[in-house]
Amino acid sequence: MQKIRKGDKVIVLSGKDKGCSGEVIKVNPKENRAFVRGVNMIKRHQRQTQNQEAGIISKEAPIHLSNLAIADPKDGKPTRVGFRVNADGNKVRFAKRSGELING
């Protein structure tokens, strides 16, 4: 089970976008990297195709998972993630800072 998943609200801990927050768009567990909406933007030169016109586009670059922390559902501050088993027998994630369950 992954600690950071698609749809999670995360905070960047280091790098040029330190302190910024956003939503995880995509996670690549084999490379330990994630794409976060609006964070770590890069410019790419786009060649013209039938569907798209040429120009310079901005898109997200991947960030290493060690540079991200989940935002605590209670106060929005960075927290570590723990796992526990519910009474139903389901394994769920919780914020170690507040003890709140993390959605998903």
UniProtKB/Swiss-Prot annotation:
GO MF, any single term: rRNA binding
SMART domains hit by this protein: KOW
Gene Ontology BP terms: translation
Entry's Gene Ontology cellular component terms: ribonucleoprotein complex; ribosome
Keyword Flavoprotein among UniProt keywords: no
Annotated disulfide bonds: none
The entry's keywords: Ribonucleoprotein, Ribosomal protein, RNA-binding, rRNA-binding
Protein family: Belongs to the universal ribosomal protein uL24 family.
NCBIfam families reported for this sequence: rplX_bact
UniProt cross-references to PANTHER family, sorted A to Z: MITOCHONDRIAL RIBOSOMAL PROTEIN L24 (PTHR12903)
Assembly, per entry: Part of the 50S ribosomal subunit.
Function: One of two assembly initiator proteins, it binds directly to the 5'-end of the 23S rRNA, where it nucleates assembly of the 50S subunit. One of the proteins that surrounds the polypeptide exit tunnel on the outside of the subunit.
HAMAP family the record matches: Ribosomal_uL24_B (MF_01326_B)
Protein name, per record: Large ribosomal subunit protein uL24
Species for this entry: Bartonella henselae (strain ATCC 49882 / DSM 28221 / CCUG 30454 / Houston 1)
